Amino acid sequence: MAEASVDIGTQPVTVKKKKSLSIEEKIDIINAVESGKKKAEIAAEYGIKKNSLSSIMKNKDKVLEAFESLRFDPKRKRLRTAFYTDLEEALMRWYRIAQCLNVPVNGPMLRLKANDFAQKLGHNDFKCSNGWLDRFKSRYGLVFRAQPVEATGISIDPSTVWYQNVLPYYLNDYHPKNVFNVKETGLLYRMLPTNTFAFKGETCSVGKLCKDRITLALGTNMDGSEKLPLLIIGKNRAPRCFKGIKSLPVYYEANRTAWMTAAIFEQWMQKLDEKFQAQKRRVVIFVDSCPAHPEVKNLKSIELAFFPSCLSSGFAAMNQGVIKSLKIKYRHCLIKKFLSSVESSKEFTFSLLDAVDTLHLCWRAVTPETIVKSYEEAGFRSPKGENDTANADAAVALDLTAHAVGAGVEFLEGLSIEEYAALDEDLETCEATQKDDAEWAGESKQDETGLYTSDEEEEDSGALEVDLPSPSKKDALSAVGTLKRFLRSHDLNDELHGSLADLENFINALSPK
């Protein structure tokens, strides 16, 4: 009995090793299941148990995401992610761009760039050790080899390389609703057709020549479903027309040049980041490479993607029709307000607050079709849209132009509404060169001591601004009543009815003044 026990105990025990599958193999299994093939046959083909196959299907979304976004080497067998996810994404993005531009990358370069990104992203405790670098290379299947030097004599256009090899990575990683482009443009917000000649071709590089200039920063997503709130940068931190104003439909900032600065851009991105965090979204925002657009630390929901400096700013989607549409609509409204004053024999007044309200109104009127077409013109993939709404804007404005001329408004000979809207397109919107810390500190100190433009300087002798008393609660309710009586004589949808009711309820809830 004892001998039998010893014999059994000494017999070799065979333990079947659990088979590990690569991500590519898991993708093949998922495709086979979804094509209708029997699960038993699939399990037998790949040498796995049925419960392992069920586990793969349960984690299908994770496997597909890892494969489609190229976050992992397809030969890898585990999907364990890193602690510094944002750092790894930035580093891989940089590595892919370097590959596309035929820039050889080695371990020391990657370590240097990893530490650089860590500082920019706020990971001050991170140090790129050999162990971390080896694990990173393993996760993404990176192998550094000597790059052969080939003198082909063929010049490569960096912009073509970027569009063909870099942009697709972003568009693969993000849904069109989460792909944004942001762009600045200058605006002479009081410029009428009667005084266009003085501004034609003006760059306003020092911010002193044009008293009525502002900078707009605007952005939309790729499918045209979302427009970011406008950012307006003026010269006066607290203009007289803003007195008593507690809220605006836009973001408003100011400095003495009415330019975008690194500080304003950083604050704006942080506000937008909070908004997208609340929506539990992850977005990419494309911006020009310039001193006013720095890397912004600690963004959790926004990835900033910088157009390479070799690309002209004209390639930005906003420059392909969105800005044009907004400005045509704005000039259209400005002329209408001017005509109303002329025909009623009243002095024309138009303040910065009027400009803010008009811009907000016109921004809401820019159509999704215009936005989608602009992205297509900029080289971004998008469903085809054939509506040329920018031209439609111009066509609508032709009748107004004829009306204006008939009322005695002088247009420059041959000046179209499109040319009128584009006269300020050359205005500079940011500092051309990077300032050092001492210069920025000095400028901030000067601004704090009152070097913002004063009301007197901005008003142009007061001819185009007027102080209006703040209406009472009773006045506001009376105005809502007048609006309701007017709208009842027109077809009104449920949404507008609801908006009117919400407006009246909001006013009623305010304390009487």
Swiss-Prot record:
<dbReference type="GO" id="GO:0005634">
    <property type="term" value="C:nucleus"/>
</dbReference>
<dbReference type="Pfam" id="PF04218">
    <property type="entry name" value="CENP-B_N"/>
</dbReference>
<dbReference type="InterPro" id="IPR006600">
    <property type="entry name" value="HTH_CenpB_DNA-bd_dom"/>
</dbReference>
<protein>
    <recommendedName>
        <fullName>Tigger transposable element-derived protein 4</fullName>
    </recommendedName>
</protein>
<comment type="similarity">
    <text>Belongs to the tigger transposable element derived protein family.</text>
</comment>
<keyword id="KW-0238">DNA-binding</keyword>
<feature type="domain" description="DDE-1">
    <location>
        <begin position="174"/>
        <end position="375"/>
    </location>
</feature>
<feature type="DNA-binding region" description="H-T-H motif">
    <location>
        <begin position="39"/>
        <end position="59"/>
    </location>
</feature>
<feature type="region of interest" description="Disordered">
    <location>
        <begin position="433"/>
        <end position="473"/>
    </location>
</feature>
<dbReference type="Pfam" id="PF03184">
    <property type="entry name" value="DDE_1"/>
</dbReference>
<dbReference type="Pfam" id="PF03221">
    <property type="entry name" value="HTH_Tnp_Tc5"/>
</dbReference>
<dbReference type="InterPro" id="IPR004875">
    <property type="entry name" value="DDE_SF_endonuclease_dom"/>
</dbReference>
<dbReference type="InterPro" id="IPR007889">
    <property type="entry name" value="HTH_Psq"/>
</dbReference>
<feature type="DNA-binding region" description="H-T-H motif">
    <location>
        <begin position="108"/>
        <end position="139"/>
    </location>
</feature>
<dbReference type="InterPro" id="IPR009057">
    <property type="entry name" value="Homeodomain-like_sf"/>
</dbReference>
<feature type="domain" description="HTH CENPB-type">
    <location>
        <begin position="75"/>
        <end position="146"/>
    </location>
</feature>
<feature type="domain" description="HTH psq-type">
    <location>
        <begin position="12"/>
        <end position="63"/>
    </location>
</feature>
<dbReference type="GO" id="GO:0003677">
    <property type="term" value="F:DNA binding"/>
</dbReference>
<keyword id="KW-0539">Nucleus</keyword>
<feature type="compositionally biased region" description="Basic and acidic residues">
    <location>
        <begin position="433"/>
        <end position="448"/>
    </location>
</feature>
<dbReference type="InterPro" id="IPR050863">
    <property type="entry name" value="CenT-Element_Derived"/>
</dbReference>
